[in-house]
Every structure is written in structure tokens, then in C-alpha cells.
């Protein structure tokens, strides 16, 4: 899927990549089959607003309804490809995550229960300036619906601090919303104007850099505390790990990821290869990683 129809005030993507356009499901499935035949074990389905897959085309031919989710159909088709171990996707949009989509993620065994749902701000005033098309309450309602439909889920997000005219009150609303959700990880950016965007043209970059930096650090500290608590629940559990290879930080250890996209480090055993699925008993956790031992039958 290419392009974007959202036109957020700070983003250049719609101006450089054009409107949303989706590839046909058969073409995607054929590409996945070729990749799997070549040894690929995990597929990432990528789009600026991936849950809007097929929406533009459905609106053109008059088949779009509130229950429409061609992306759920795509997930089901890719899930049926033999030899594929896991399916990930990014990034969904608040307005295109309906019950059909949530049920597909829940029921399809190869689909990872990971949702990267960009927030950007917890302030309705700032969200409106950003042209994000949802309110903080609508965002939280979307998170609630997903959590109700899925017993175990990983949430990550994007946040911008220091957007033009952002006050301390606006920032604190963002901080509180992030605490309410409890994200597993977040990409937190300090605002900088992008040439050619509405925000660069119409809004003053009036938040001091030192204030942006401080707000960034506060959110990072909150995030680490929450992530450490979230990861602690995995201690003494057994997790299925898709092996990636030797750890970049410790050549004596190997690394892989859980279905919830948690990095897991472990000592290798004889015969292990990248792409294998192994069961690992988790012995220790941090805010960023899990550490365990492969269970040998």
C-alpha cells in the first residue's frame, strides 16, 4: 500500500507519495509465496495507514461500509501461505480498526498481536492543529476495543513534543494519556518544521528547544518505567521465539522475538538456525528485553 489521504499538518508524505493506493490481494499473496520459498519466515505488511487498505478503491466503486475491512481479508489470505511463521503490520489508523479487523488479528494464528497506533498528542487542541482527525477520547476508545477483543496485546506509538503552541497543560494531557495506555514502546520526537507542510507554513515554531528536550526526557522516563512493569509479567513464562541470529550486543548470546515483538536473548543450542521457532523459559526481564533459556526436549 502506498500514499496517504490524511494530510496531517506536519507531514510531507501525502505531498511526496500521493493518495492511498492498494495492491491487489492476489499480487501480494504471490509475492509472499516467492519470499517464503526463498526462506523468509516473517512478513511485514506496510502502509502509512495500513488498515485503510482497499478503502479508496471501495469508495470509488461504492462498496465501502462501516464494516468494510479489506485488510482483514488480506491478513486471512497471507495467513494461509504455507511455511510462513509470522505476520506483522504497521501502521493502523484509529478510524479504520473495526470489529472485523480486530477479530482477524485475534483469530489468525500467524498474525502477531502488535499494534503500532500513532498518538502524536493527548491534547484535543493540538490534535486539531495537527489535523489528526480524532480526539483523545476516540483514541482511547480504540485502544479499549482492541484490549477487549484480545487477551494479550502489545501497543507502541509515535508522539511529538513541542508542537507549535503546545503548553504545559497540553503536554500533561499527552503524558497522562500515555500512562493510561501503558505502551510497550514509543518513538518520541521533538517537533521540527518540515518544509512544504502546513505547520511549517502557518504555525510558529515557538516552543523552546530546551522545553522540547525536557518534555521528551520526561516521556522517555515514564515509558521506561511502564515498559519494565509490562515486561516483568513474562518472568517464569515460556515464550515462542522466532530466532534472528547472534546478538549484536553479546556475541555469546543469540536473539529473537516473541509474537508480541519482545526482544529475547538466550544462549544458543546445537543445531539452532535463524528462522527457527523455539520455546524459551524467561528468567529475567528489563524495560527493553527478555532473557531466558531454550527448552530442550
Language model regions located:
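C-terminal, non-catalytic macromolecule-binding modules
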Residues: 169-219
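Conserved SAM/AdoMet-binding glycine-rich loop
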Residues: 37-168
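Canonical Radical SAM [4Fe-4S] cluster-binding loop centered on the CxxxCxxC motif
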Residues: 1-26, 56-59, 200
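Conserved alpha-helical substructure of the radical SAM core
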Residues: 15-44
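Conserved, mostly hydrophobic/aromatic
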Residues: 8, 28, 45, 89, ...
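Terminal RNA-binding accessory module
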Residues: 199-297
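N-terminal pre-triad scaffold of radical SAM enzymes
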Residues: 1-9, 33-37, 41-44, 241
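Residues at the N-termini of beta-strands
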Residues: 10, 42, 86, 114, ...
Amino acid at each position: 500500500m502506498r500514499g496517504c489521504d490524511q494530510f496531517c499538518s506536519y507531514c510531507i508524505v501525502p505531498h511526496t507519495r500521493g493518495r492511498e493506493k492498494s495492491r491487489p490481494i492476489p499480487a501480494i499473496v504471490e509475492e509472499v509465496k516467492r519470499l517464503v520459498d526463498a526462506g523468509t519466515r516473517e512478513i511485514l505488511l506496510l502502509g502509512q495507514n495500513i488498515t485503510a487498505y482497499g478503502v479508496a478503491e471501495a469508495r470509488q466503486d461504492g462498496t465501502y461500509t462501516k464494516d468494510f475491512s479489506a485488510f482483514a481479508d488480506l491478513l486471512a489470505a497471507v495467513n494461509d501461505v504455507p511455511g510462513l511463521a509470522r505476520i506483522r503490520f504497521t501502521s493502523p489508523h484509529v478510524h479504520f480498526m473495526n470489529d472485523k479487523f480486530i477479530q482477524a488479528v485475534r483469530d489468525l494464528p500467524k498474525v502477531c498481536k502488535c499494534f503500532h497506533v500513532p498518538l502524536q498528542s493527548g491534547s484535543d487542541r493540538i490534535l486539531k492543529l495537527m489535523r489528526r482527525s480524532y480526539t483523545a477520547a476516540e483514541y482511547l476508545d480504540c485502544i479499549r476495543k482492541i484490549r477487549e477483543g484480545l487477551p494479550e496485546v502489545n501497543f507502541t506509538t509515535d508522539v511529538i513534543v513541542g508542537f507549535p503552541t503546545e503548553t504545559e497543560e497540553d503536554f500533561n494531557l499527552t503524558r497522562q494519556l500515555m500512562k493510561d495506555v501503558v505502551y510497550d514502546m514509543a518513538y518520541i520526537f521533538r517537533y521540527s518544521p518540515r518544509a512544504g507542510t502546513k505547520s511549517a507554513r502557518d504555525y510558529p515554531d515557538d516552543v523552546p528547544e530546551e522545553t522540547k528536550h525536557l518534555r521528551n526526557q520526561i516521556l522517555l522516563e515514564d515509558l521506561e518505567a511502564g515498559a519494565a512493569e509490562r515486561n516483568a509479567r513474562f518472568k517464569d513464562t515460556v515464550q515462542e521465539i522466532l530466532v534472528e541470529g547472534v546478538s549484536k550486543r553479546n556475541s555469546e548470546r543469540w536473539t529473537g522475538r516473541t509474537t508480541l515483538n519482545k526482544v529475547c536473548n538466550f544462549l544458543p543450542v546445537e543445531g539452532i538456525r535463524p528462522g527457527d521457532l523455539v520455546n524459551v523459559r524467561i528468567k529475567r526481564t528489563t524495560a527493553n528485553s527478555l532473557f531466558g533459556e531454550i527448552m530442550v526436549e
